Amino acid sequence: MLRELMHARVSADLVVGSSVGAMNAAYFAGAPNAAGIDKLEKVWRGLRRHDVFPVTFRSVLGFMGGADNLIDPSNLRRLIEHNIPFPNLEDAPIPVHVVATNLGGATVCLSSGPTVEALLASAAIPAAFPSVHIGEHHLIDGAVGSNTPILNAADLGATRIIVLPTGFACALHEPPKGAIARALHALTLLIAHQMVRDLRQLGGKVDVFTIPNLCPLDVSPYDFSRADQLIEQTAGHTRKWIEGGGLSRPGDPEFSVAAYTLTLRWLPRVTLGRKYDSPAIAKTNNEEPVLADTDAESSNLEPINAM
C-alpha cells in the first residue's frame, strides 16, 4: 500500500501507529521515500516466524511454570534496533506517535522518548510478550485499547485520513493452530470491528479514504511464509483503487461501515479471533495527505512522554 501511495505522490505530515503497525509507521517516519519503502518491504519479505515469535520448549515450560509471558522479546528488540534509525521518537524526520495500552485499559500515546521501548510496548501482545514499563505506566499492545488510527489521527489535527487496513483472515476454513496464532487472529478481527465503530463515531467530521483490504483471505497473521504474495497482491489491489479514483473521493462513513460489515460476514463461524496493526494516512491543513498509524478513541487518549 505504501509503495502505491508513494507512486501516487501521497506524502505524510505525521505518522501514528499501534501494535505492529507502529513499527511500520516508525520505519516510514525514518525514511519517508521510495527507497525507504523498498527496504521495509525487504524486511518483511525476509522475516520468518522465529524472528518475531521464538517459542521454544524452554519458554513453554517456563510459561507453564508461572512465567508472565511465553516469548522472550530479545529477537523483536534486535529487529527494531537494526531497522529503526532514530533513537528517540522526537528525532524522526516526520512526527511519529506510538499508541499502547496501560493496564487500566486506557490508550496511551507516546510522542517522545526511546523508540525501541515505545515500539516494544505497542506490540506487547498480552501473555505472549512482557509489558513494558514507561514513565508511570506498564504498557501492553495498543490493539487492546483500540487499534485503528482513525480517531487518533483526527485528534492530532488531521483533516484528511487515508486508512491502510491490515485486514484479517476472512476465509479460513478451520481455526488457526496454536495459542499465538489464535491470539493474533483474534486481534485482527478486533481491529476490523473497531474500524467499523470508529468510522461511525467519526461520522464525516474529516475526509476518510479507506483502501479496501484483501478478502477473501486465508492467510493467518502467524504465517510469514507468504509475505511476497501478500505484498504484491495488496500493491495491485491498491493500484486499482487509486486508478479508480479512490484518493479523490472520501468515502461515505455509512458506506464504509457497510463494506466492512459485509467483509466481516465472510468469516465462517469456526474462525473467531483477531490482531496486528494498521497504519493510516492522515492530513492536516495542507493539501497533501498525511500518514497516520494509530488506534484510540479521542476520549481515551492519554498523551505522555516516554521517559
For the regions a language model picked out, list residue spans one by one.
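Patatin-like phospholipase
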Residues: 1-80, 111-121, 165, 169, ...
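Short active-site oxyanion
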Residues: 11-14, 105-106, 137-138
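Conserved catalytic block of serine-dependent lipid acyl chemistry
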Residues: 21, 112-215, 232-239
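Alpha-helical membrane-targeting segments
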Residues: 52-71, 173-196, 254, 258-274
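A short alpha-helix-loop-beta-strand transition element characteristic
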Residues: 84-95
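Short beta-strand scaffold segments in enzyme catalytic cores
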Residues: 96-101, 130
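C-terminal helical/tail subdomains of lipid-metabolizing enzymes
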Residues: 198-307
